[in-house]
């Protein structure tokens, strides 16, 4: 699977929310594009990632 331009090995298909949490990313504070399409937050628990997917993850950072 390709994540933010880097290839990683996905041991088995998993839900997007599980994947984000395994990378210490809070699903509330990220935007995700999967194979060129934005994934709605309400779908994070039902979307399944597969080895052939391309994922872009953007984290929101507060500041002033």
Language model features: what each stretch is:
Residues 1-63:
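Ubiquitin-like/PB1-type beta-grasp interaction modules and other compact soluble beta-rich domains
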